Amino acid sequence: MQKKYVVALDQGTTSSRAIVFDHDANIVSVSQREFTQLYPNPGWVEHDPMEIWASQSSVLVEVLARAGIHSDEVAAIGITNQRETTVIWEKATGKPIYNAIVWQCRRSSEICEQLKAQGLEEYVRENTGLLLDPYFSGTKIKWILDNVPNARAQAERGELLFGTIDTWLVWKLTEGKVHVTDPTNAARTMLFNIHSLTWDNKLLEALDIPLSLLPEVKPSCSVYGTTRIAGEGSEIQVAGMAGDQQAALFGQLCVEPGMAKNTYGTGCFLLMNTGTKAVRSNHGLLTTVAVGPKGEVNYALEGSVFMGGATIQWLRDELGLIRDASDTEYFASKVADTNGVYLVPAFVGLGAPYWDPNARGALFGLTRGANRNHIIRAALESIAYQSKDLLDAMTKDSGVSLKRLKVDGGAVANDFLMQFQADITDVEVLRPSVCETTALGAAFLAGLAVGFWESVIELEHKACIDKHFIPNIDAETRVRLYAGWQDAVARTRA
């Protein structure tokens, strides 16, 4: 039977999804299932790994059945996933010894402080590209080994396996035959040397993690094994894998140095490809691994904003200023400007490039003439200002001035926000026709690995742009508006 499709498994923080793409990179079928969020203690976040697998395997069956697609027609399955989330399971039984500790979980803060006391902060920064933070997998692994009865003894005997979610899914898909990850996910563990592209023995020793626990690291664009859908039909190749933000970067075909994408979700994730050069940031950004045009290792600068779409949720849920997120475009467009109002949405502190956990949200410039429309417009503009903060930091670190910014995520449907983003950054903003770029990136990697597509050049003909947003304000206005934002941020941090 002719191979007509590639399936992307998109395992996210709140739901598991499966998306079928045809040879023209069109979406044919989508299936999605949410799963349980567990909060056993303040600041702790967990998932049940078996529920993740159940939700992901069921949507894989559903997505094909819904479109009447036979498994024989599927060329490959690609994987993209929430990064950093940590699973440890028994090699013999495949049974997790503890719930998955989610990237948001802060329980290993004390372990991070111990590593800082040992003087490892600079070593971590230099060799992994990351900050010493509980966000990343390394300290989560140590917490499980230290706190689950008998776990450390089992690990020392080589009876346990660790994986981020990509590794866990491949293990389950291949029925325990393959224990593997890719460089983009390995680079988020805080255990991976991004220069030698190997596990870092000094960090493993510092955290007392046996090497036998860790998966083999294979290229993001390669075949890892085979699977059968629900144990039936012919074998399908499991091929192509990347963490969610790197998958989106590849899905946007940002495969050359200086190309960048911004994902507008709950927060914002801005990544810039820096090619074969790992650029160290002096402005609060992370240095991480990306995927090059032939599936090889490239590097990227990454910055994250905590409050993107979440700011709009606040307008809706806490202030009651809007009924739906899409209302913001209408209200923001009813006024010519914010009337001097700035919202700094530092509800949980400020992310890159400030990294100020003590900052708190504030509205500035309120006068008797300020109304609902001005506040809504200021909220939308705050997302663009924060993204400009990241973009300026990337320009300083990389020495590359961006000319075009590719965008994806839920908020890109808002034309007002996209136009203001172009205006305030003086950069052309490109919105793709297919905004499912994370899943598309996984599909591209899988399809390239098995020859479903020949090259990135072929893919460029399939990646259509829905709309170009051209900068439309003068330099003087841009400087004045951004100076107002910088002043508001400074006051928030005072």
From Swiss-Prot:
Inhibited by fructose 1,6-bisphosphate (FBP). One of its GO terms (biological process) is glycerol catabolic process. It catalyses: glycerol + ATP = sn-glycerol 3-phosphate + ADP + H(+). ATP binds at T13, T14, S15, T266, G309, Q313, G410. GO terms for cellular component: cytosol. Glycerol binds at R83, E84, Y135, D244, Q245. ADP binds at T13, R17, T266, G309, G410, N414. The keyword Magnesium does not apply. This is Glycerol kinase. It comes from Shewanella baltica (strain OS185).
